[in-house]
Amino acid sequence: MPASNDPVAASRRCETVSADVAIIGAGPVGLMIANYLGLQGVRVVVLEKLEQIIDYPRAIGLDDEALRVFQSVGLADVLLPHTTPDHWMRFVTHTGHCFASIEPRTDEFGWSRRNAFIQPLADRVLYEGLRRFPHVQVLFGTSVSGFTQDPAGVTIEADDEKGGRRTVRASYMVGADGGNSFVRRLLDVPFEGRTKPNQWIVVDVRNDPIGSPHIYMHCDPQRPYVSAALPHGIRRFEFMVMPGETEEELSKPENMAALIRKVVADPQKVDYIRKRVYTHNARLASTFRVDRVLLAGDAAHIMPVWQGQGYNSGIRDASNLGWKLAMVVKQLAGDALLDTYTAERRAHARSMIHLSEVAGDIFAPTSRFGIKFRDAFVRTFNVVPAMKRYFVEMRFKPMPRYETGVVLLAERKRKHGVMARVLERSGHSAPGRLLGLMSEKRESLLGRLVYGRDPSCHSPVGRMFIQPRVRTAEGSVVRLDDVLGSRFAIIGWGSDPTFGLSPLARETWQRLGGCFVLAKPDNQLDFHDDVPAGVIAIGDVQGRLKEWFARVPESVVLLRPDRFVAGMCTPQQVSDCIGELALKLSLKPAEQPAVKLAVPERAVAPESVAGVAAVAAVATRA
């Protein structure tokens, strides 16, 4: 990765850069997309107006899906030292009573479901990961002043910090430039939603003065506040800014001491990192694509922080968009594949916004009615155990489920009956948001009442596939994705997934760079007679694959590079499913040039690890 502070490059007053994909913004989403494209051999240039990666903490929560994406680009092991797994969220009354604790203990996707992390260090891991790719360039201190599109690509005009001009020509452009996105505004894409009236002041400190693990949401009616333990001895406090207060006033030593005294006995012995006031927003772009320009992360959606889903939703965008962009720029798939990005991601981003708003309604209601609703909701926990389990086990979290796009599901229109219309009208109230969120679970009673019976609601198609530990033929026990890599995969349980495969289907799968996998009970792995050439055999160490396949009528699953289930079938139907999938992908004819999707490298170079360690030392020391 060419360095952005190269003195020769800095001396140029006018420069033209050519790339397959230009990414505006070197935040976590832009850097993640760049890593994914870098693994696929795609030429990428990242333009960032700041002179370096932001070095102050913002997001503090990382979920299992996001960690799985880090794994897909070979960076999970480098990130793990900067995370705290099993980071529970506890809701506490003003008297100190814990009335609810979100502590999911499952790991179906291979990682802890709730993790604390230090975002600047995670961003540094992503940036250092780009050193693996000479075809990926990051240009700091480069502000985009405009861009134009034509049928062949995007031309971007930018200014560097030395007063020079840069022209970037790319086939596609991704706007990952934050909530105040210049790209989105220039495209004139509506950013629909609302801004909450309350502000919050965030205070990050070193040498944790409390030390207790987890995150505590104190529902104090006088001033709600948050206390969160973070890795490397850092703690975050968040206090609601009350009407009439300002950041300047609250930042005065005596006022800050009064705030901190609520949680720390001696405010004079607190080692501050920074203080910052922010406002909660809940907004969603009307589309994530305009011709050859795509929006991702905060440029496409912003949400309140209460479930830590802003960062994670952006990483999901990167995972969904990365492999599709790679296929299109490599001329393997047609441009229509990129239309599935909005179709798949926008609905789930909206659900995560609703989830974040509901969490805010519970923790910090902004009206007397909201407080009464919250208190009534909490009281049901003690009399309705099922309600408490639903909350504690995070069953309320909307998991991505793609009903359109690159999935082999029959098209079905949602039913919008009386209940649906009632929820739409009450959607901006606390009860309306909660019920609307619960109705997204289509298999639930409320989901059926609102949207009607969905024959495919229990189907795994369109959902993320599990990631258990498996044994390889060489005897290693690894996570499933470490075997599959970032490529298409067909997994058959107990039978050869290539049996009866037509020559055309086999050729199509080879062009996709896909692999064939035979999963079997672990004790059968040493028997090789049932494993044909070109098929990867894995042992089901934990029994989770057997359990998963026992719940569905089919025994073969087609997986996308982002590990979502594209389709399910019997061994006799694999050829037909591959043909259907090719149509969903807008796969180009065989005579077109094609490049296989690569298996990710497992780790960054040693010098990159050293760079991350150095940043960690700075973050915890100064």
Curated annotation (Swiss-Prot):
Reported cofactor(s): FAD
At which positions is FAD bound? 20-49, 288-298
Going by the UniProt record, its keywords in alphabetical order are:
Aromatic hydrocarbons catabolism, FAD, Flavoprotein, NAD, Oxidoreductase
Catalytic EC class: oxidoreductase
- Catalysed conversion reaction: 3-(3-hydroxyphenyl)propanoate + NADH + O2 + H(+) = 3-(2,3-dihydroxyphenyl)propanoate + NAD(+) + H2O; (2E)-3-(3-hydroxyphenyl)prop-2-enoate + NADH + O2 + H(+) = (2E)-3-(2,3-dihydroxyphenyl)prop-2-enoate + NAD(+) + H2O
Q: What's an example GO BP annotation here?
A: 3-phenylpropionate catabolic process
The EC designation for this entry is 1.14.13.127
The record's similarity note reads: Belongs to the PheA/TfdB FAD monooxygenase family.
Protein name (Swiss-Prot/TrEMBL): 3-(3-hydroxy-phenyl)propionate/3-hydroxycinnamic acid hydroxylase
